[in-house]
């Protein structure tokens, strides 16, 4: 599987997971811009950058800063980072979500606090 295909599948997995949790999900065309996914529910927006890898996902500091700056310009919005890995036997943390063949984690920035969407 190509890296770009895996990345697209990871975005759809993260988006589908959010949809199952009651969020309306919109994907960035071509994954251009700071957010790959915008999710909306009850006047709250989540601006989400998705990173996927079979190892440790790579993210540049500028990507994080751009996402945070974007969220600062939009009221009631929160910048999140989502890590998507092929399903493995160990969880990254207590809020890891097993979704199909993937293990998904969401972190709110800039605090890097894990988000539990299953509550």
Named regions from a protein language model:
Residues 1-28:
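Acidic-basic catalytic patches of nuclease active cores, encompassing PD-(D/E)XK
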Residues 5, 76-119:
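Domain-level recognition of nuclease-like catalytic cores that cleave nucleotide substrates
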Residues 14, 18, 37-39, 43-54:
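Conserved catalytic cores of phosphodiester-cleaving nucleases, focusing on short active-site segments
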Residues 20-34, 38-42:
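Active-site metal-binding core of divalent-cation-utilizing nuclease and nuclease-like domains
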Residues 34-35, 44-45, 76-80:
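Short, surface-exposed beta-edge/turn micro-motifs
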Residues 54-65:
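Active-site-adjacent loop/helix micro-motif of nuclease/hydrolase catalytic cores
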Residues 69-76:
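Arginine/glycine-rich "motif VI" loop of SF2 helicases in the C-terminal RecA-like domain
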């Amino acid at each position: 599987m190509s890296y770009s295909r895996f990345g697209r599948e990871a975005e759809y997995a993260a988006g589908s997971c959010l949809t199952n949790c009651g969020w309306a999900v919109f994907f960035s065309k071509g994954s251009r811009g700071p957010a790959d996914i915008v999710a909306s529910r009850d006047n709250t927006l989540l601006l989400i950058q998705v990173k996927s890898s079979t190892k440790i996902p790579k993210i540049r500091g500028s990507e994080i800063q751009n996402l945070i700056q974007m969220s600062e310009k939009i009221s009631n919005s929160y910048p999140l980072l989502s890590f998507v890995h092929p399903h493995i036997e160990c969880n990254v943390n207590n809020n890891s979500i097993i979704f199909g063949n993937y293990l998904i984690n969401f972190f709110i920035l800039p605090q890097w606090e894990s988000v539990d969407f299953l509550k």
